[in-house]
Amino acid sequence: MTIKLAITPGEPAGVGPDLIITLAQQQWQAMLVVFANAELMRTRANELNIPLTLLPYDASRTDIQPAGSLYIVDIPLQDEVIAGKLNPTNSQYVLDTLHQACQMNLNGEFQALVTGPVHKGVINEAGIPFSGHTEFFAQQSNTPEVVMMLATEGLRVTLATTHIPVTAVSAAITQPKLDNVIRIIDHDLRTKFGIAKPHIFVCGLNPHAGEDGHIGREEIDTIIPALNALRQEGITLTGPLPADTIFNPKYLQQADTVLAMYHDQGLPVLKYKGFSQAVNITLGLPFIRTSVDHGTALDLAATGQADVGSFSIAIKEAISLAKSTQ
C-alpha cells in the first residue's frame, strides 16, 4: 500500500513553505500531500527560484509524485503573505490547515501527519487561544492525554509536562499524571516503534533527584510510588535519576527513551546532541504525527538559506513509523 503523508507548512510567512518546496525536489517513497494555499506555494517557489509542480490531491490516486512536484489540498488564505512578516489575519488559515490534515488522518485517508513550524504568538495575538500543535491535535482527536517526544540519533526524550510555566510544574507532577504518561510511552514504543519491551529511564524533578527528600519531596511522595506501581505491571523503568547524570552513555545505551519532568529539563540536551537533526513525535494520538524541532525562522523565509535537516528527518521518521504499523 502506498503511504500517504499529510504535510502542513505552518506559519505562511516563515520557512515552512520553503522547506517543503526544497524537499519536494527529492524523490520520496511516499505520497507527499501538502495542506496549504496553492498561490502561496507557487509564489514562494518563484521567490526561491525553485521549479515546483502542484498536483491537485484526489483520494483515489496512489501514485507517488515525481521529484519537483507535490500533491496539494488547496486552502484559502485570509490575506496576502509577505515572507518574513507575521500577519495575525492569517492565523485562521494556519488552523484550517491543521484541522483538515488532522481530520483526514483520523478518517484513515493518510498514514501520518508531518507539521512545519507555527508561530504561537501571532495565533494568540489574533484572539485564538493556542498553546501548540500537540495540544491542538489532542483536542481535535478527543485524546485526553498525549506525550511529546523529541528524537535524534541515539536519543529519545519524552516529557511529563510540556508548555506550562516552571512555577506550575511541581503541582502538575501527580501520580495519575505519571501513570498516564508512562503508559502512553510504553504503548507507543511497542506499537509504533516496534520495541518489544521498552526500557524507560525517568528523571527526578529536583537537583540530585531530591537528595533523599532534602532538596524537595516530589521524588519520594509522587515519582517513586508511581514508578513502583507501574513496575508491578511489568513496565520496565529505571529511576528517578538526577537529570545531570541520566544523560550519559552508561544509561543511554540501555534507554529506549528518557522521560524528563519538564520541557527545559530534557530538550536542551536533545537539541545540543542533534541540533537541526531532531524530530518531534506526538505519542498517544490515534495517528502518527511528526514535526520539525525548530521555529518559524522568519528572517530566513524566501532567502534559500533555511536548513531542511529537521523537516527531512520528520518526513523520513513518519514514513518509517507508517511502515512499521502497516
UniProtKB/Swiss-Prot annotation:
Assigned keywords, A-Z: Cobalt, Cytoplasm, Magnesium, Metal-binding, NAD, NADP, Oxidoreductase, Pyridoxine biosynthesis, Zinc
Subcellular localization: Cytoplasm
Keyword Zinc assigned: yes
EC number: 1.1.1.262
UniProt cofactor(s): Zn(2+); Mg(2+); Co(2+)
Gene3D superfamilies cross-referenced by the UniProt entry: Isopropylmalate Dehydrogenase
Catalyzed reactions per annotation: 4-(phosphooxy)-L-threonine + NAD(+) = 3-amino-2-oxopropyl phosphate + CO2 + NADH
List of residues binding substrate: H133, T134, K271, N280, R289
Co-factor note (free text): Binds 1 divalent metal cation per subunit. Can use ions such as Zn(2+), Mg(2+) or Co(2+).
GO biological process, one term: pyridoxal phosphate biosynthetic process
Pathway: Cofactor biosynthesis; pyridoxine 5'-phosphate biosynthesis; pyridoxine 5'-phosphate from D-erythrose 4-phosphate: step 4/5
A matching Pfam family: PdxA
GO cellular component, one term: cytoplasm
GO-annotated molecular function: 4-hydroxythreonine-4-phosphate dehydrogenase activity; cobalt ion binding; magnesium ion binding; NAD binding; zinc ion binding
HAMAP family for the chain: PdxA
Job of this protein: Catalyzes the NAD(P)-dependent oxidation of 4-(phosphooxy)-L-threonine (HTP) into 2-amino-3-oxo-4-(phosphooxy)butyric acid which spontaneously decarboxylates to form 3-amino-2-oxopropyl phosphate (AHAP).
Family: Belongs to the PdxA family.
The protein, known as: 4-hydroxythreonine-4-phosphate dehydrogenase
